[in-house]
Amino acid sequence: SKYINKDYQKVTEYLNYLYKEIDLLFEHLNKNHIELNVGTVFFGGGSPTILNREDLKKLVDKLRGLFDWSNVEFFTVESDPRRVDEDRLIYNHEICGTNRISFGMQDLDPEVQRRVNRIQPVKLFEDLLTSKVRKMYKEIAFDLLIGQPGQTLESMSKTCDEVIRLKPTLVQLSLMAYKPWVAKYQVQMLAEGPLPDFLERKELLEIIHNKLKAGGYIRTGFECYSLPGSPMTKAFDEGNAHYGASGHQTGGRVNFIAVGSSSMSNLGNDYYVQ
């Protein structure tokens, strides 16, 4: 689900409902004497960085009071580069305890960004990924979205060059799903021509694969590339990488329990809930 909103009161209302959902979940777990062994916490969605500092900390404190946090190896906050700065990333780490960032950067080509109305120049990422921030976070992930309007082999090649230069530890790929009946804003994506077709998307994926491989990245999953020595590469080498509801994961845990709008859960290979 998607909801474009600039009224923070709506965010506050959403958080109140989220807290109720969390309480219902843990009421059920406690009633059935189920104690969670949590190894990964992931704040995703559109972007949890819409939350102000106080509300993010309040949400983290809420969760810390419900289960043992000592086994949490990775705590990710998916971050919109247009909503955060270096100081906010430092706050998220030092005060809230995050140690992994995921940027839904999608594409770095200015023309593609214009056509999808998501302007985020390369300089945004340069200013965010300072040496201080890089030292604080175990993993920095970029998400590339394939099939967007205006993407060409040349533009994707340049985007890959910039990604390699920015040096995230992890690059994950996904194909854009054109569903204007769900996301009405997608209708305008066809205003200047069709989206890349199946063969064009295949060629884009080949460009990405060849570029990232030449840039030192290792393919550690069907749609996942990581740097040598990174957490994902280590997990892949040790046979502990797996694919879950939020993409490729490190560690041996296979259950993913999610809450909130558009959340996705999976319990082993038997159950999937959205």
Question: Model-found features: residue ranges?
Answer:
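C-terminal scaffold of the Radical SAM
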Residues: Y3-H28, L36-Q274
